[in-house]
């Protein structure tokens, strides 16, 4: 495994995206994390992916960890900024750094939603997507106590934005300190189960319905945030080609099969990924990396 490099990638809109890069052969995995989770949480996943000889680009989220931004009344961003500006900039950088290597988007939770949105908007830019522990926060996908918690959050989020100018998830126990635009889009998803970029909540889902590229959903058996119903609420968007869904148990993970524990011991996740890649045939499609 080559030594990790830390780079900042200019997105052309006044922001530099922090990325941890490990160069290897074979496919490249662009890893995107969960809501409120900084990049170092995925260090073991990066090491496990790199141990396969693969290249890895771990993208830090805006407002977390090594990001120069922090959400406030003055500093705000949304799903659209990440999906239309940050991810394409990182893909451009990967195309220059790892010429002709197939690229896969690997997203955990919110990162999985970002991967799905990218699949709807510019599927020609990468080979396929992997969504891990990625369920929709759609209220209808939850029952009883869990549903009430999501409903309370949808009411609390606008109030927080008025009071603080951002969402203080680090104090509320859900997510981190998040930009109001991100949480407004998350709230819209919880209320409608539709991805929203700016004022448009139709374009992405309409495009994603036609996606036919390789796609894998890894679901944890006892994940309250990404239950079978919540995961199905994501997968139903893919109307022409439903992603393959695989379920990992506590026995396979050698730890609790929940929303976060898999990342502590990611060997089972990476083993599933390796088998899926072998079945799919890595790099079988021609990538339009030059746009």
Which functions belong to the PLM regions below?
Residues 247-291:
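Catalytic active-site module of serine/aspartate enzymes centered on a nucleophile-bearing elbow/loop
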Residues 26, 34-37:
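Active-site glycine-rich loops that stabilize anionic/oxyanionic intermediates
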Residues 106-194:
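Alpha/beta-hydrolase-fold enzymes
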Residues 39-41, 46-71:
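Conserved alpha/beta-hydrolase
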Residues 213, 227-237:
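Short alpha-helix in the alpha/beta-hydrolase fold that links the catalytic acid
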Residues 211, 217-219:
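Short beta-strand/loop motif that positions the catalytic acidic residue
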Residues 76-95:
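Alpha/beta-hydrolase active-site loop
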Residues 1-21:
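N-terminal cap/lid segment of alpha/beta-hydrolase-fold proteins
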């Amino acid at each position: 495994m080559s030594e990790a490099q830390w780079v900042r990638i200019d997105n052309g809109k006044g922001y530099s995206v922090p990325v941890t890069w490990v160069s290897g052969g074979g496919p490249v995995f662009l890893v995107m994390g969960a809501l409120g989770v900084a990049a170092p949480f995925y260090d073991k996943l990066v090491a496990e992916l790199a141990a396969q000889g693969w290249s890895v680009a771990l993208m830090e989220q805006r407002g977390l960890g090594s990001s120069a931004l922090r959400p406030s009344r003055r500093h705000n961003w949304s799903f659209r900024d990440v999906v239309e500006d940050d991810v394409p900039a990182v893909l451009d950088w990967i195309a220059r750094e790892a010429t002709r290597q197939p690229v896969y988007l690997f997203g955990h939770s919110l990162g999985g939603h970002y991967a799905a949105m990218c699949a709807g908007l510019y599927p020609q830019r990468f080979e396929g997507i992997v969504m891990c522990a990625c369920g929709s926060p759609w209220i209808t996908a939850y029952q009883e106590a869990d549903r009430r918690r999501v409903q309370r959050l949808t009411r609390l989020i606008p109030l927080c934005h008025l009071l603080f100018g951002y969402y203080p998830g680090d104090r509320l126990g859900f997510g981190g300190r998040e930009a109001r635009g991100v949480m407004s889009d998350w709230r819209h998803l919880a209320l409608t189960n539709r991805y929203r970029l700016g004022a448009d909540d139709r374009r992405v889902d309409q495009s994603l319905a036609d996606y036919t590229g390789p796609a894998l959903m890894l679901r944890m058996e006892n994940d309250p945030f990404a239950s079978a119903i919540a995961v199905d609420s994501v997968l139903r968007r893919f109307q022409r080609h439903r992603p393959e869904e695989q379920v990992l148990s506590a026995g396979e993970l050698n730890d609790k099969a929940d929303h976060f524990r898999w990342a502590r011991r990611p060997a089972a996740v990476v083993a599933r990924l390796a088998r899926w890649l072998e079945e799919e045939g890595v790099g079988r499609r021609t990538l339009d990396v030059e746009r």
